[in-house]
Amino acid sequence: MAAPQRSGSAALLPSANGAGRAARRTARQVPEELLNNVELREAVGALPSNYNFEIPKTIWRIRQAGAKKVALQMPEGLLMFACTIADIIERFTDAEAVVMGDVTYGACCVDDYTARALGADFLVHYGHSCLIPIDATRGLKMLYVFVDIKIDTSHFLDTIRFNFAVGSSLALVSTIQFVAAVQAASQELQSQYKVCVPQCKPLSPGEILGCTSPRLARDTDAIVYLGDGRFHLESIMIANPGIPAYRYDPYSKVFSQEHYAHDRMHGARQAAIRSAARARCWGLLLGTLGRQGSPAILQHLESRLRALGRPFVRVLLSEIFPSKLQLFDSVDAWVQIACPRLSIDWGEAFSKPLLTPYEAAVALGDIEWQQPYPMDFYASQSLGPWTANHTARPAQEKPPATPSLKKWH
């Protein structure tokens, strides 16, 4: 597409009165003496100025918690800054800093278990949203730092105006790093366009994940994604196959229309479901990379397979590779409780069907095949107990009748 050529903290109990709200503000407010600390400002100057690592807030929270060992976890794209941040923390607090170097794909990879095993009493997770609640990391204080990235929003706005007619209905989405930029852009565009910044709770407005995206109104003219890469964009494209999608890369300032092979993906996933429906022995893969695996989903699948008389084996893996699964000759079909995109994007690389929990529900007759394909893995409102945040998990004493497999042969 053409572009114009121009140069997480400790929880506080809610209160019904204003005093409670004031107390919360006081507890969360970074002291002025820390914000204005000349030495701290000089130290922060070693980090890129357009990346907000929230160093004063981090120092303040560590001091508040009285932490002695702080674990730092971040995606590989930010690891180059880890040593600098660790040095700052050790200089301005009484804590020792430990950098966790294992791969971190997303907010689902929050690794409080390893942090505790290392003896840490405080974990700072960078670059992702609060997918795992801070009160779920027992025995470990936690802080999420989104690492908001400042960009040239004027060029982004000019690009939108150059490519879309006034009055168009636009859905603006991004990853957590650019959500603030999306919000600012939506305010600027509202006078000329019908702008929507959709939300799929518990995510922030405008935020999408590779496995979780909202369904949009049918009269939406275009999806505009602000970010580099396609992984997250593909999620909302899968959830909204009839809406044209565009990507603005804030680094290269390139604006492009993006396409997705929906029919090919649907065909591949339906073929895997048909094959799995005939399987005798099932393998249940629980991802152990941080918090990727959901024990609740695992328990639900175990209950369903028992009710249907299907033998199964449980396997725990941090990362799932075809060569590893080939070692299990007796397993006829796999269900991986880790990342749905592993099956969607790479399922054909495996010799046996590798289903998502949703696809397993289809194969077992618990739900019909959905159009469009649901991208609701972490959504608060999801289709059923094969998603991570589904709360109404019905008892399985009286499971649905054993499905007819004719439609999946």
Swiss-Prot record:
Provide the reaction this enzyme catalyses.
L-histidyl-[translation elongation factor 2] + S-adenosyl-L-methionine = 2-[(3S)-amino-3-carboxypropyl]-L-histidyl-[translation elongation factor 2] + S-methyl-5'-thioadenosine + H(+)
The record's remark on the cofactor is: Binds 1 [4Fe-4S] cluster per subunit. The cluster is coordinated with 3 cysteines and an exchangeable S-adenosyl-L-methionine.
Q: Spell out the subcellular localization from the entry.
A: Nucleus; Cytoplasm
Q: Which residues bind [4Fe-4S] cluster?
A: C108, C211, C339
The protein's required cofactors: [4Fe-4S] cluster
Disordered: region residues: 1-22, 388-409
Can you supply a Gene Ontology BP term from the record? protein histidyl modification to diphthamide
- Functional summary from the UniProt entry: Catalyzes the first step of diphthamide biosynthesis, a post-translational modification of histidine which occurs in elongation factor 2. DPH1 and DPH2 transfer a 3-amino-3-carboxypropyl (ACP) group from S-adenosyl-L-methionine (SAM) to a histidine residue, the reaction is assisted by a reduction system comprising DPH3 and a NADH-dependent reductase.
Q: Which protein, by its recorded name, is this?
A: 2-(3-amino-3-carboxypropyl)histidine synthase subunit 1
What is the species of this protein?
Answer: Gallus gallus
Q: What is the lineage of its organism?
A: Eukaryota, Metazoa, Chordata, Craniata, Vertebrata
